[in-house]
Regions:
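Aromatic, loop-rich ligand-recognition surfaces of beta-strand-rich domains
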Residues: 6-8
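Phosphate-binding site recognition
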Residues: 2, 11-320
C-alpha cells in the first residue's frame, strides 16, 4: 500500500485494494438513505470511500467540504461517525480495513442541520440548545452554562475529559441560511447566530480538546461572512485528494453497479457499451479539482438504475 503526503496535509493512502466479494452482488439501491450502518447491515449497494477517509481520521485536523445537494455528504458524515465510534465490524472488507488504522473510540459531536429546526432564528437557537442537551444527557453529563456558545464549548471539554479528544461533524452547515435567502433580514440573523456558534471551535480551550472537525454543506460562504471566527479550516472543496470523496468514479460505477448496467441495457434493448456511453453523457459532468477526475452524481445514478430510464433526476429534485 503506497503512501505519501500532499500540500494540504492529507496522507495519500493508496486505495487499490478491492472490496470483498460480499460487495459485488446486485444489492438494493439506497435512494435517499444516508445512514452507513443501515447500508451495510441491510445489504444496500455501497460505493467504498473509506480509503479516502482513513488518512483524515487517522491524522485528525479541521476540514471543510462543499458539494452540491444529493451528492453523498450526509453519508460521508454518517460513515465518519461510525468510524469514530469504533464500529470496526461494519467496515469488514472495505478499504479502511486494509490500512493500519487502529480504531480508537472517540467522543462524537454531530449536528445535522437537515434535522434541526431553523424556521426562525429563535427556533434555531433553541433547537441547537436541545441538540447539545441531548448529547450531554446520552453521555451522562450535566452542563452548567446556559448561553449557547458556552454550552457548546462545555460539552466538548467535558466529553474530552471523559473520553479523549473529540470529533465534531457538522452536516448542512449552511441550510438555515440558504432556506431563508428570500428574506435578507432572517438570513442575516441566521448567519450571525451560526457565525458565533461555529466560532466556538476556534477558542483555545475547545481547540485543544479536538481531534477532528468536518464541516460540510452546499455553499462556500466567505470566511468574513460566516467563518471569520473559524479560520483554521482545511478546505477540501477543490483539493485533488478529495475530488472523488463524493460522487461515483467510472471505475466505481462499473464495479458496484455492473449488474444494474446490464439490466438497464436489457430494458433499453441496447448494448452494455452503449449504456455506459449514455450514463457518461447524462450524469458524468462533475469535476471538483483541477485534475481530470470526473464523478457521477449518486442521486441521478441510483434513480436511473431504480427506474431503468434516463431523466434529469438531480435537476428536478429541488434547489439549491
Amino acid at each position: 500500500m503506497g503512501a505519501g503526503s500532499c500540500g494540504c496535509g492529507i496522507l495519500n493512502v493508496s486505495c487499490a485494494a478491492q472490496p470483498s466479494e460480499r460487495f459485488f452482488a446486485m444489492k438494493k439501491l439506497q435512494i435517499g438513505l444516508q445512514t452507513f450502518e443501515t447500508l451495510i447491515t441491510q445489504s444496500f449497494a455501497y460505493v467504498d470511500k473509506t480509503g479516502l477517509l482513513a488518512p483524515l481520521v487517522s491524522q485528525g485536523g479541521r476540514y471543510f467540504l462543499s458539494r452540491p445537494r444529493r451528492f453523498g455528504k450526509s453519508l460521508t458524515c454518517s460513515t465518519l461517525d461510525a468510524i469514530f465510534c469504533g464500529r470496526k465490524e461494519l467496515f469488514d472488507g472495505l478499504a479502511i480495513s486494509k490500512t493500519d488504522y487502529t480504531w480508537p473510540v472517540r467522543p462524537v459531536v454531530r449536528f445535522d442541520f437537515e434535522q434541526i429546526d431553523h424556521d426562525t432564528p429563535e427556533r434555531l437557537e433553541q433547537s441547537l440548545h436541545n441538540t447539545i442537551n441531548n448529547m450531554a444527557s446520552k453521555a451522562g453529563l450535566v452542563l452548567s452554562t446556559q448561553l449557547l456558545k458556552e454550552k457548546f464549548a462545555e460539552l466538548i471539554v467535558k466529553l474530552a475529559e471523559q473520553g479523549g479528544p473529540v470529533a465534531v461533524i457538522i452536516d448542512e452547515y449552511d441550510k438555515a441560511i440558504l432556506d431563508h435567502l428570500a428574506n435578507k433580514t432572517k438570513a442575516d440573523a441566521m448567519r450571525e447566530l451560526l457565525r458565533n456558534f461555529y466560532g466556538t471551535l476556534k477558542s483555545k480551550d475547545v481547540d485543544s480538546n479536538l481531534h477532528f472537525v468536518f464541516i460540510t454543506g452546499v455553499s462556500k460562504f466567505s470566511k468574513v461572512a460566516l467563518f471569520s471566527e473559524l479560520n483554521n479550516l482545511n478546505d477540501l472543496t477543490m483539493d485533488g485528494h478529495a475530488a472523488t470523496l463524493c460522487g461515483y468514479t467510472q471505475a466505481e460505477l462499473e464495479l458496484v453497479f455492473d449488474k444494474y448496467i446490464d439490466a438497464l441495457a436489457t430494458e433499453q434493448n441496447k448494448t452494455k457499451a452503449y449504456m455506459l456511453d449514455e450514463l457518461r453523457r447524462w450524469y458524468n459532468g462533475y469535476q471538483f479539482s483541477k485534475q481530470n477526475k470526473k464523478v457521477y452524481n449518486p442521486f441521478s445514478i441510483l434513480n436511473c438504475f431504480g427506474k431503468n430510464d434516463f431523466s434529469n433526476y438531480w435537476f428536478t429534485s429541488g434547489t439549491p
